[in-house]
Amino acid sequence: MNGSVLPSRGRVTINQVAEAAGVSKASVSRYIGGDRQLLADATARRIERAIDQLDYRPNQMARGLKRGRTRLIGMLVADILNPYSVAVMHGVETACREHGYSLVVCNTDRDDEQERHHLAALQSYNVEGLIVNTLGHHPGELRALHRELPMVLVDRQLAELDTDLVGLDNADAVEQALDHLQHRGFRDILLVTEPLDGTSSRIERVQAFNASIGRRPALKGQVLQTDDFFRDGLRAFLSASGPGPKALFTCNGVATLCATRQLRDLGCRLFDEVGLLALDELDWYPLVGSGITALAQPTDEIGRTAFERLLARLEGDREPARRVTFPAQLIVRGSTHPRG
């Protein structure tokens, strides 16, 4: 082996490995491409020594592109600061790693132009499939991309896309919440949600809430969005007379944080004057007062399942689009202690 070929800096190339081993570039390509059985044992040993000496790392992206495979999965999220998105992303990334894929995450920060930019970027990265948890304000671009590669939606249905969806069973979660609150003696329920903004999961929860309240004559219910009028609406709810003890049902972690801050600022004693049940389970819920009762979403399983559906499509599954939903798990804490 010619041991004099040692690059002083920069990325080691396949040509340098071939020169150091005294073999052709094609032989090195066969070696790193898994076709070592085509090489003489002595040739393979020289290539191995050269790779070790030069600390050569094959460019996996380039190798993948030559074979039509990058083993990259794209994930588009609306808000990377949202704990739900982070938790689902963890499940997706874990499943990707277990199957030999890498995850490329793009955060739109709820910005329409960023969403458009990231869709173009992900396409340029040659991702093999895409997982989408975003506002979907560019259905044309999403449809065009879906014609080229498989796509799975998380949490939010986009009417323009006929593709798999993985998320929570929203109707069941609302039923669990109202069953628990009613059993604990609450009668006046305020559902708190982020602005609907066409987001299917938020709309489904509001619709399920209104329908369930309509079937429960003992309960009174109303809906309040966390917009500029939220503080005034919350104050009005707390001060109004009603059929009995009051409770808030917050539809996600962001709404829960907003509601607890406003309750504190309004001087409301948590959780003596009003009960609270939150959808999503966040690390800080047990730390507030006597703890916030929660409906935990199986975020890790949702993320894993989203990747598994995408993998099935990559492997040739051509069945009609499926909706895979999971039930929430009720975790009871002091915020919904029984009322007389």
Curated annotation (Swiss-Prot):
Provide the protein name: HTH-type transcriptional regulator PtxS
Q: Which CDD domains match?
A: HTH_LacI, PBP1_RegR_EndR_KdgR-like
Instruction: State the phenotype upon gene disruption.
Output: Mutant exhibits a twofold increase in exotoxin A production.
At the top level, the lineage of the source is Bacteria
Name the UniProt key words of this record, in alphabetical order.
DNA-binding, Repressor, Transcription, Transcription regulation
DNA-binding residues (ranges): 14-33
Q: Which Gene Ontology BP annotations are present?
A: negative regulation of DNA-templated transcription; regulation of DNA-templated transcription
Q: What does this protein do?
A: Negatively regulates glucose metabolism by binding directly to the promoter region of the kgu and gad operons. It also negatively regulates its own synthesis.
The record comments on the domains as follows: Contains an N-terminal helix-turn-helix DNA-binding domain and a C-terminal domain that binds the effector.
Matches recorded under InterPro entries = HTH_LacI, Lambda_DNA-bd_dom_sf, Peripla_BP/Lac1_sug-bd_dom, Peripla_BP_I
Q: What induces it?
A: Expression is enhanced by the global regulator MvaT, which binds to the ptxR-ptxS intergenic region. Negatively autoregulates its own synthesis by binding to a specific operator site within the ptxS upstream region.
Q: Which residues form a coiled coil?
A: none
| Activity modulation notes | 2-ketogluconate acts as a molecular effector and causes dissociation of the PtxS/PtxR complex.
Subunit note: Interacts with PtxR in the absence of 2-ketogluconate. Binding of the 2-ketogluconate effector to PtxS causes PtxS/PtxR complex dissociation.
Domain (HTH lacI-type): give its ranges: 12-67
Any single Gene Ontology cellular-component annotation: protein-DNA complex
Which species is the source of this protein? Pseudomonas aeruginosa (strain ATCC 15692 / DSM 22644 / CIP 104116 / JCM 14847 / LMG 12228 / 1C / PRS 101 / PAO1)
Q: Name one GO molecular function term.
A: DNA-binding transcription repressor activity
